């Protein structure tokens, strides 16, 4: 039993839409970072699906997916470090209360 390409693309589209919804509607900075990670995981699903179905013998999609995972890990580490610093200074992670021009 094989899963068709459309199923993977639908799953990735749903995950990406959930990530965009969370990015737009969330005021919490940690939730915004989680939404960005969800969107990057949807991109990874697309890369893996297209790599498997378009050219199964070459590993181009897997290489790009590893690259995206690496960038996502670096983004998460830097983002959480910035959020931790802001939390120590402001005592909140509410995005609307962040105004870096005014201390």
UniProtKB/Swiss-Prot annotation:
* Topology relative to the membrane: Multi-pass membrane protein
Q: What class of enzyme is it?
A: translocase
Extract the coiled-coil ranges from the record.
none
The EC number(s) attached to this protein equal 7.1.1.-
Q: Name one Pfam family in it.
A: Oxidored_q2
Biological process terms in GO annotation: ATP synthesis coupled electron transport
Q: Has the keyword NADP been applied to this entry? A: yes
Q: Which GO terms describe its cellular component?
A: NADH dehydrogenase complex; organellar chromatophore thylakoid membrane; plasma membrane; plastid
User: Sorted alphabetically, which keywords does the UniProt record give?
Assistant: Membrane, NAD, NADP, Organellar chromatophore, Plastid, Plastoquinone, Quinone, Thylakoid, Translocase, Transmembrane, Transmembrane helix, Transport
Q: Which GO terms describe its molecular function?
A: NADH:ubiquinone reductase (non-electrogenic) activity; quinone binding
Q: Does the keyword Thylakoid apply?
A: yes
Location (main, coarse): plastid
Transmembrane feature ranges: 3-23, 32-52, 63-83
Subcellular location field: Plastid, Organellar chromatophore thylakoid membrane
Catalyses: a plastoquinone + NADH + (n+1) H(+)(in) = a plastoquinol + NAD(+) + n H(+)(out); a plastoquinone + NADPH + (n+1) H(+)(in) = a plastoquinol + NADP(+) + n H(+)(out)
* Assembly and binders: NDH is composed of at least 16 different subunits, 5 of which are encoded in the nucleus.
What does the UniProt function comment say about this protein? Answer: NDH shuttles electrons from NAD(P)H:plastoquinone, via FMN and iron-sulfur (Fe-S) centers, to quinones in the photosynthetic chain and possibly in a chloroplast respiratory chain. The immediate electron acceptor for the enzyme in this species is believed to be plastoquinone. Couples the redox reaction to proton translocation, and thus conserves the redox energy in a proton gradient.
Q: Which family does it belong to?
A: Belongs to the complex I subunit 4L family.
This protein is called NAD(P)H-quinone oxidoreductase subunit 4L, organellar chromatophore
Record the organism: Paulinella chromatophora
Give the gene symbol. Answer: ndhE
């Amino acid at each position: 039993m094989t899963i068709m390409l459309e199923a993977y693309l639908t799953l990735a589209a749903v995950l990406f839409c959930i990530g965009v919804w969370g990015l737009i509607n969330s005021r919490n900075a940690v939730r915004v970072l989680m939404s960005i990670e969800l969107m990057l995981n949807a991109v990874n699903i697309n890369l893996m699906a297209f790599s498997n179905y378009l050219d199964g013998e070459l590993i181009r999609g897997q290489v790009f997916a590893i690259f995206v995972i690496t960038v996502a890990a670096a983004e998460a580490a830097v983002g959480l470090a910035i959020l931790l610093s802001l939390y120590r200074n402001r005592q909140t992670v509410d995005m609307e209360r962040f105004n870096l021009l005014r201390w």
